[in-house]
Design a protein with these regions (language model features):
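Extracytoplasmic/cell-surface-exposed regions of Actinobacterial cell-envelope-associated
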Residues: 165-178, 193, 197-207, 236-240, ...
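N-terminal membrane-targeting/anchoring modules of bacterial envelope and secretion proteins
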Residues: 1-182, 195-196, 200, 342, ...
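Membrane-embedded hairpin module used as a gating/binding unit in multi-pass transport
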Residues: 170-179, 183-190, 207-224
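Long, glycine/tryptophan/cysteine-rich extracytoplasmic
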Residues: 2-66, 106-111, 199-267, 306-326, ...
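Hydrophobic alpha-helical segments of membrane proteins
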Residues: 13, 172, 176-180, 221, ...
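Extended, compositionally biased non-globular segments
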Residues: 251-290
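Alpha-helical transmembrane segments of multi-pass integral membrane proteins
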Residues: 87, 91-149, 184, 188, ...
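Acidic/Ser-Thr/Pro-Gly-rich, low-complexity N-terminal segments
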Residues: 349-432
């Protein structure tokens, strides 16, 4: 996990030194340049002259996020304990937090000399969201399934996450193609942006910057295709209407439409077709698809937060977050509901008939006869028990003759003693 961060810091330092050398700037700006490049790489924000820029190029950030997630997945793919996960999470979140705090301190120290500022803390929280996303992706579905089994969570929740990612990846691919098509259609606006620069270095820089901002435009296109409006300061762009203002001189912005033709509303079927394709190709239960719709909406919210933000005097640039989240959920959930209903109609539940067990009815006379037979059997059993008890007593008497003789002798002795006493009493009376 330390390797991607170390490589990123090294590249940031090299890029900062190279940029200062090529622009003939003073090395006094080195610390502030390093800090701003680090925040830009982590999709945080940069500030200066009282303005905040958080609409940053997402391509370098997404590559960095992929590198961190790949390193995490390599560390946990074989075997990992809960303690190891705790240490891993602490490193994944603790290292960028420490580096971001150092970058903020460097900007604060340089603000007394240079025209730079520390970005608002709310913008810096995107750095933590960035690395949380890397941790979530790096753990992978296999580890999440193991954790679900360990803590009693339903395992189909992981299937819902996978289903949501399928939809977002397919939707993003289609949106990227639409951006390239729109750029090709508006090629005149693309080339007109570069005609104001004479030197080739500036043209190359604009093209490179457009490529770095390409994921941002792709996410904006996803929002437009789902029906959400895109705000660019006072401008509003959607498939229903377009209200434009002068945009920054960036060639990739030629992909944004300058007007909304009447047929543009038909583009709203694209996400529905994609959701249908995903649900049919990977059939899931209704509960799984509904959960996948919720996860898709939340993941798209994260993407929209990374792609948009504040852009100097334009203020907010980005999608309507509430509308985007709601529409993504509605599209996926509605398609999942329809497919589940159609599948239920095509494959109804078969109810197997249970054979009834015949019940034999007995007549009252037979019941009375059975009861009388039971009573007679009980009486016979009691008589047999009494006879057995009598026989046991007789056997005991026969087995102990000595005891009986002793008892008879003792009785005779008692009678003899009684007669002797009576004789003595009579003689005493005669003497008197």
């Amino acid at each position: 996990v330390l390797i991607p961060h170390g490589v990123a810091v090294l590249l940031v330092v090299i890029l900062a030194v190279a940029s200062l050398m090529f622009t003939n700037s003073s090395m006094v700006n080195l610390s502030a340049t390093i800090a701003q490049l680090w925040l830009s790489l982590n999709l945080g924000a940069v500030a200066g002259s009282g303005e905040v820029i958080s609409v940053l190029p997402t391509l370098p950030g997404f590559i960095f996020l992929w590198a961190i997630a790949a390193r995490i997945h390599r560390a946990v793919k074989d075997r990992v304990s809960i303690a190891d996960l705790g240490v891993l999470a602490a490193l994944v979140l603790g290292i960028p937090l420490a580096l971001t705090a150092i970058a903020a301190f460097m900007l604060f120290d340089a603000s007394s000399v240079l025209n730079v500022e520390v970005p608002p803390i709310t913008r810096l929280l995107r750095v933590m969201l960035f690395h949380l996303s890397a941790l979530f992706l790096g753990m992978g579905p296999r580890l999440w399934q193991a954790l679900a089994r360990r803590y009693g969570a339903p395992e189909w929740l992981i299937d819902a996450i996978t289903q949501a990612f399928r939809f977002l990846i397919a939707f993003g691919t289609v949106s990227l193609v639409s951006v390239l098509v729109m750029t090709a259609i508006n090629h005149s606006a693309f080339t007109a942006t570069m005609q104001g620069y004479d030197d080739s270095a500036s043209v190359v820089a604009l093209i490179v910057l457009s490529i770095l901002y390409l994921p941002n435009i792709m996410i904006f296109a996803m929002g437009n295709l789902i029906g959400s409006p895109l705000y660019f300061g006072d401008a509003s762009i959607s498939v229903f209407s377009v209200h434009s203002v002068p945009l920054p001189p960036l060639p990739i912005l030629a992909a944004l439409p300058s007007e909304a033709p009447s047929w543009a509303v038909a583009l709203l079927v694209i996400p529905a077709i994609i959701a249908t394709w995903v649900c049919v190709r990977n059939p899931m239960r209704l509960a799984v698809n509904t959960t996948a719709a919720v996860i898709s909406a939340l993941c798209f919210l994260v993407l929209a937060v990374f792609a948009g933000g504040t852009l100097g005097v334009y203020n907010y640039v980005g999608l309507n977050l509430l509308a985007s989240v709601g529409l993504v959920f509605v599209y996926f959930a509605l398609v999942g509901l329809l497919i589940a209903g159609i599948d239920k109609l095509r494959n109804p539940v078969e109810v197997k008939s249970v054979k009834a067990v015949p019940v034999v009815e007995t007549e009252p006379e037979e019941v009375e006869e059975d009861e009388e037979e039971d009573v007679e059997e009980e009486v016979d059993e009691e008589e047999e028990e009494v006879e057995e008890a009598v026989e046991e007593v007789e056997e005991d008497d026969a087995d102990d003759p000595e005891e009986n003789s002793e008892e008879e002798e003792s009785d005779e002795e008692i009678e003899t003693e009684t007669e002797a006493e009576e004789t003595n009493d009579g003689s005493e009376a005669e003497d008197r």
